[in-house]
Amino acid sequence: MANLQNGINAWIFLNEDEPPQTNYNSPESCYQSLVDCKVYDSASFLGIAFFEVIPAAQGSTIQIGNSSHPGGLTNQDYLNFVLRDARQVNPGIKFLATMVYSGANTLAAVFSGSGDPQTQASNFANNLVAYLKDNGMNGLDIDWEGDVSEKMTRSQFQILFSAIRNEFDRQPVKYYLSFTPAWPTDTTDYSAVNSKFDFVSPQFYDGTPLSAFLDAGISPSRIGYGAQFEPGNAAPNASAQQVWSMVSEGFSFGSALYDYQDIFVWRFNSGNFQFEQAQFMILDQLGNPPSSNIFDDTPIINAAGNPNLTQMTIRSGDVLNAIQAVNTGTGPYNTGTQGTGTGIFTLLQHGGNSGGAQTFNIPLNDPIVSISGYTGVWYGWQCVLQLSLTGKSGVTYGPFGSMAGSATQNRFVQPAPAGQSVVGFSGSTVTVPLAGGSQTAIIATLNAVFA
């Protein structure tokens, strides 16, 4: 059960460069993989961290926090680049300014001095909207923990976010207000949370359970799911499948069952960025299954750092019904969350659920270097009739598919270029009728992805 009214979203932390000593424009940079692999295409909202409160001509406003990067670039440069590149990849993406939670420049600074709190909040709200308009951004995200949650009073909370909501609602286009608390606090006005914010994504990865937020007063109809794929995280934050299993089931509160309203993932660019970005793309496919009959593992596998294919599940009968790949990362940036030195990427199944399923493991030191088989016509349908896979050592897996009922058989072989191996697949499916009136998808065309 999942509604995800507010989408599948992620944060990006502009202070950090990965790999170390790279900058935004380095070909191997975590920022370039977001563009090259079209990771941004999987995000509804991008929270850009961290913004600070600064004085303005009248009251206060926001600016991106200061940090320097190799090559003389600044966080302002990075902000400009991200806004440009993410929207080129995904014209529909929405940008949230994520506010800093510690130090002297949190949202609590809006109320510095001895002015009238309502006037201070109104001035900030006006300046905030002007900043968002000038920079092509779509809203504000509140990381509620640490200094900001300790220095701002409950009354100030209500005044500030009411003023922001009122100013947002006066605009001709929609502006969004997001609340991402690490834990409940006494300074939170929960009536304001429920009435002023568009969505609420608790940071469950910090260990506070859902029940604590609901018991504190957050409406169950507002709740989203905060996830994280950084090293050190255990289940249910160790894979896209684990997060989706939690979210898709929804949750009970009182006697009712509720959907989570969004997923918000911290973040795109830690030292585990290849794992994070690829898992995010898989999570998007789980939440928004591709509607096309065409499939291509290439973008996800590239984002993951082209890890070896280490397990296959193949469904077959007369023909090749479905394939599903599992890849294992062993590099410095794709080794998962649990300190095992490996990161597991379980891709989506391509094809239907008919035929018998066989799962086999592929040793890391004996990668698949060739696929072969037959295509042809099966009861009038052009499809892949049979598939075999061959490892570097010469070991063969298969054949899968008996070719019974086929009218034609055409042999194919796809060997990997020297020094490369099979890391995924692309192709298409076709839906065919089955005996008894049902139908299923089978593999119509298939190509190996090499890296």
Locations of regions flagged by a protein language model:
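RTX-like calcium-binding, glycine/aspartate-rich low-complexity repeat tracts
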Residues: 1-2, 451
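Chitinase-like catalytic core of GlcNAc-active glycosidases
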Residues: 2-249, 253-260, 269-282
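Residues in well-ordered beta-strands of folded domains
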Residues: 11-13, 226, 264, 324, ...
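Glycine-centered small-residue hotspots that permit tight backbone geometry or close packing
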Residues: 89, 136-141, 262, 288-292, ...
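Cysteine-clustered segments with highest specificity for TGF-beta superfamily mature ligands
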Residues: 247-264, 412, 423-428
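Lectin-type carbohydrate-recognition ectodomains
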Residues: 283-451
